[in-house]
Amino acid sequence: MKNILFRINELSKKEKATGLTVDEKQEQQMLRQNYTQTFRGSLDSILLNTKIVDQNGLNVTPAALQDAQIRLKLSK
Protein backbone atom coordinates (compact mmCIF):
# COMPACT_ATOMS: atom_id res chain seq x y z
CA MET A 1 0.00 0.00 0.00
CA LYS A 2 2.84 2.38 0.85
CA ASN A 3 4.58 1.55 -2.42
CA ILE A 4 1.41 2.31 -4.38
CA LEU A 5 0.92 5.63 -2.62
CA PHE A 6 4.58 6.55 -3.10
CA ARG A 7 4.37 5.84 -6.85
CA ILE A 8 1.09 7.79 -7.17
CA ASN A 9 2.71 10.80 -5.53
CA GLU A 10 5.83 10.42 -7.63
CA LEU A 11 3.79 10.42 -10.85
CA SER A 12 1.72 13.36 -9.64
CA LYS A 13 4.85 15.44 -9.02
CA LYS A 14 6.23 14.51 -12.41
CA GLU A 15 2.91 15.39 -14.06
CA LYS A 16 3.01 18.87 -12.53
CA ALA A 17 6.67 19.38 -13.41
CA THR A 18 7.11 17.94 -16.90
CA GLY A 19 3.98 16.01 -17.83
CA LEU A 20 3.48 12.27 -18.22
CA THR A 21 3.79 9.91 -21.14
CA VAL A 22 0.73 7.94 -22.21
CA ASP A 23 2.07 4.84 -20.43
CA GLU A 24 2.73 6.78 -17.22
CA LYS A 25 -0.76 8.29 -17.34
CA GLN A 26 -2.27 4.80 -17.69
CA GLU A 27 -0.12 3.55 -14.82
CA GLN A 28 -1.25 6.49 -12.69
CA GLN A 29 -4.92 5.76 -13.37
CA MET A 30 -4.46 2.05 -12.63
CA LEU A 31 -2.61 2.79 -9.37
CA ARG A 32 -5.29 5.26 -8.26
CA GLN A 33 -8.06 2.73 -8.94
CA ASN A 34 -6.16 0.03 -7.07
CA TYR A 35 -5.50 2.34 -4.11
CA THR A 36 -9.14 3.50 -3.99
CA GLN A 37 -10.47 -0.08 -4.08
CA THR A 38 -8.09 -1.16 -1.32
CA PHE A 39 -8.95 1.86 0.83
CA ARG A 40 -12.70 1.36 0.41
CA GLY A 41 -12.37 -2.34 1.18
CA SER A 42 -10.52 -1.56 4.40
CA LEU A 43 -13.07 1.06 5.41
CA ASP A 44 -15.97 -1.29 4.67
CA SER A 45 -14.33 -3.97 6.78
CA ILE A 46 -13.90 -1.58 9.69
CA LEU A 47 -17.46 -0.29 9.49
CA LEU A 48 -19.00 -3.74 9.14
CA ASN A 49 -17.28 -4.77 12.37
CA THR A 50 -18.35 -1.68 14.34
CA LYS A 51 -20.98 -1.50 17.04
CA ILE A 52 -22.03 1.86 18.48
CA VAL A 53 -23.09 1.86 22.13
CA ASP A 54 -24.43 4.85 24.09
CA GLN A 55 -23.59 5.76 27.70
CA ASN A 56 -26.29 3.42 29.00
CA GLY A 57 -24.89 0.46 27.12
CA LEU A 58 -27.66 0.41 24.51
CA ASN A 59 -26.82 -0.50 20.95
CA VAL A 60 -27.42 2.65 18.86
CA THR A 61 -25.80 1.39 15.66
CA PRO A 62 -27.67 2.89 12.67
CA ALA A 63 -30.22 0.53 11.12
CA ALA A 64 -28.57 0.64 7.70
CA LEU A 65 -25.27 -0.51 9.20
CA GLN A 66 -26.98 -3.26 11.20
CA ASP A 67 -28.72 -4.47 8.02
CA ALA A 68 -25.39 -4.56 6.17
CA GLN A 69 -23.81 -6.49 9.04
CA ILE A 70 -26.64 -9.04 8.96
CA ARG A 71 -26.34 -9.44 5.17
CA LEU A 72 -22.59 -10.00 5.56
CA LYS A 73 -23.11 -12.69 8.20
CA LEU A 74 -25.74 -14.43 6.05
CA SER A 75 -23.46 -14.48 3.02
CA LYS A 76 -20.59 -16.18 4.90
From Swiss-Prot:
Main location: cytoplasm
Pfam families, A to Z: DUF896 (PF05979)
Disulfide bonds: none
Signal peptide: none
UniProt keyword Cytoplasm, yes or no: yes
Keywords noted in UniProt: Cytoplasm
Location of this chain's protein in the cell: Cytoplasm
GO cellular component: cytoplasm
Sequence intervals crossing the membrane: none
Similarity annotation: Belongs to the UPF0291 family.
PANTHER family in the cross-refs: UPF0291 PROTEIN BC_1827, UPF0291 PROTEIN CBO2609/CLC_2481
Name this protein carries in UniProt: UPF0291 protein BCE33L1708
Record organism: Bacillus cereus (strain ZK / E33L)
Lineage, top ranks: Bacteria, Bacillati, Bacillota, Bacilli, Bacillales
